[in-house]
């Protein structure tokens, strides 16, 4: 399709979509549209959203990526919105413990620096996932009663660009990294997915369900847009 634009746009037509979706991905733009939509209609939609697309591309280009973790003693790690200092202890087996303002982690002393970093990262990720499943299940149980829904299952995923999902059969998956965020953000994500059991879309009716439980949900959505890239271990 010849769009006659200097914007880095790729158009994808699929039978799986009923509406138009525009995504900013790695400095480019993916426009995903229903297969039945004419090229002329697609061009018109892109033209109308040109200002929005340029704004999003500019914001992405100005975004500073978080500094990669080094997995060394004294480094800060966040859990449920609070920062903890990592304290590495030689002659350990990878068990992670929360002690006051510290996350202590024992590692085998014989490991090389590279192997130690990998060992520490894997141990921390395992700890975060274990706590994520526990906390997300607890929060889901709480909000299920309020919304009067019963998920078929609660599981964790390692999503790259989403915080959760809800299948038509009621299977809910959460991105385990959401447990890094403050409590109120985790609550929003849990309610967001549970409300999809009432409305499997993002219609005004769906958002009314969300707002009935999380009145300030728009602030939580904005928080995730601004801070989501920093939620990693």
Which residues fall in each region the model found?
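Active-site-proximal or metal-binding-adjacent scaffold patches in catalytic folds
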Residues: 1-187, 197-233
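Walker B catalytic acidic pair
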Residues: 193
